[in-house]
Amino acid sequence: MSRPGREHVILDRIRGTVPPEFADDAVRLYRTILAISCSRQRIRILNAKLDRRVALCGIKHCGKTRLGNALAKTLGLPFFDTDALLETDAGKPVRAIYKEVGETKFRELEAETVRKFIASAPSPAVVALGGGMVSNPVLTPDDLHALGMIVWMDVPVPTAFERMAREGLPPFLADKPDPSVEFNRICAVRRPVFRAAADAVLELPEVLPVEEAIDRLLTVLESKVISK
């Protein structure tokens, strides 16, 4: 019997067993328990197959840290953020580093941090990559491959810019006559780089609750890990 057929039989038995006034509540409870059970089984299977780090890349403020942290908690894995690691190494915020040393030196420092991470970090794990890290000229394709399975979070540019504007524009945009135009230009340059580097793409054309975004991300990972 198919799964839908089995579920139909079980629901009929529930409705036939409990008092009519409690039948709808009993059915809802059954479906909640079933959903939790399926979710746990899904995570167990993915954990058993996942043998690499999951590295989330994408434009600045696409939600890598938020979603990466949530994914790590869902899978019971450690979480890292390359910007946070760089801040720890330098002893100051990423924006301050960039403003003080300029982009060329910033990319060199970023590459040092990433290579140190590759050499020492556990695997599997989840890591959020800095917005420009995939296009860092100091890093090689081998460096990117060593980070893990790269998943590109493809979000609309206006969504990311709106989030960034709320927090305050970074140095590379703050002095531009039209920051939104410059951000669009940067994103247009980086999109093909993200696509070329990515092992998988997570498309997020609309703003979603984190639970729904995680569900989509799990589906993407399953397509790459379980089917191989």
Can you say where each PLM-predicted feature lies in the sequence?
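A glycine- and Lys/Arg-enriched "phosphate-lid" helix/loop adjacent to the NTP-binding pocket
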Residues: 146-191
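P-loop (Walker A) phosphate-binding loop of NTP-binding proteins
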Residues: 59
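Short glycine-rich anion-binding loops that position phosphate/pyrophosphate groups of nucleotides
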Residues: 130-134, 156-158, 207
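Pre-Walker A (Motif I) flank of P-loop NTPase domains
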Residues: 50-54, 122-124
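ATP-dependent small-molecule kinase phosphotransfer cores
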Residues: 82-142, 169
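Walker A/P-loop
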Residues: 65
